[in-house]
Swiss-Prot record:
Record carries keyword DNA damage: yes
Role: The RuvA-RuvB-RuvC complex processes Holliday junction (HJ) DNA during genetic recombination and DNA repair, while the RuvA-RuvB complex plays an important role in the rescue of blocked DNA replication forks via replication fork reversal (RFR). RuvA specifically binds to HJ cruciform DNA, conferring on it an open structure. The RuvB hexamer acts as an ATP-dependent pump, pulling dsDNA into and through the RuvAB complex. HJ branch migration allows RuvC to scan DNA until it finds its consensus sequence, where it cleaves and resolves the cruciform DNA.
Stretches the record annotates as Flexible linker: 151-161
Subcellular compartments: Cytoplasm
Protein name (database record): Holliday junction branch migration complex subunit RuvA
HAMAP family tied to this protein: DNA_HJ_migration_RuvA
InterPro entries for this protein: DNA_helicase_Holl-junc_RuvA_I, NA-bd_OB-fold, RuvA, RuvA_2-like
Organism encoding this protein: Prochlorococcus marinus (strain MIT 9215)
Length: 225
């Protein structure tokens, strides 16, 4: 059973609404389905380091082995929780994470926002009801953590900026920066850019990523002296 992989990116491709990478790990090529957000970052060269790390959910079937890759452990285990719901398959699980962030889905489950959940491709009214019914109790503590992180630690109420910062955190994790380092850079960026109040419309993910990496690399350089 494969649970985690670190290797060199060989190729990316898209088949309908499925997004894939081929990773070379010690001479073996692993075909892995990934989320659209990470796929787009790779395709637009927003991630210069082509050696990537993914958390893997390995699903065995009679005629095939399927690998689903995520840039954080949280994404992987959220995906697993989604698959625990009756009638929800792997592609529905990927559609959910392609459409919304973890915090947005958890909030929708908590508030029983069926309209938002039904906007996800492949999910109708009955499946929306099942997702809310079967996941609401599981994510009770997780909701509190997400809300605390979004309001008290980061103080971001704008959903677009929150999603931007969440994507930044996941990307830095995939580039092998330590969680301790990442936790220090996020408040710095928020304070430096005045994100909660300015809500900058022209702020790009690439600029944020470069600023974060430069700051982290500078900090590591100072520690090495």
């Amino acid at each position: 059973m494969i649970s985690w992989i670190n290797g060199e990116l060989v190729e990316t491709w898209q088949t309908n609404q499925k997004f894939f990478v081929l990773i070379n790990c010690q001479g073996l090529g692993y075909e892995i389905q990934i989320l659209e957000s990470f796929f787009l970052k790779l395709k637009t060269n927003q991630i210069s380091n082509k050696k990537i790390t993914l958390w893997i959910k390995h699903i065995k079937k009679e005629d095939s082995d399927l690998l689903f890759g995520f840039t954080s452990k949280d994404q992987k285990f959220f995906f697993i929780e989604i698959l625990s719901v009756r009638g929800v398959g792997s592609q529905i699980g990927m559609s959910i994470l392609n459409k919304f962030s973890i915090s947005e889905i958890i909030k929708a489950i908590k508030t029983q926002d069926k309209k938002l959940i039904c906007s996800i491709p492949g999910i109708g009214q009955k499946m929306s009801d099942r997702l809310i019914l079967e996941l609401k109790s599981k994510f009770k503590s997780k909701i509190q953590i997400e809300e605390e992180k979004g309001q008290e630690e980061f103080e971001i109420t704008n959903p677009e900026i929150y999603k931007l910062m969440e994507d930044l955190q996941l990307t830095l994790q995939s580039l092998n920066y330590k969680n301790k380092e990442i936790k220090t850079i996020l408040p710095f960026l928020i304070k430096e850019l005045g994100l909660p109040t300015k809500k900058e419309k022209n702020l790009s993910f690439e600029n944020l990523l470069n600023l974060a990496m430069n700051h982290l690399d500078q900090g590591n350089s100072n520690l090495a002296r």
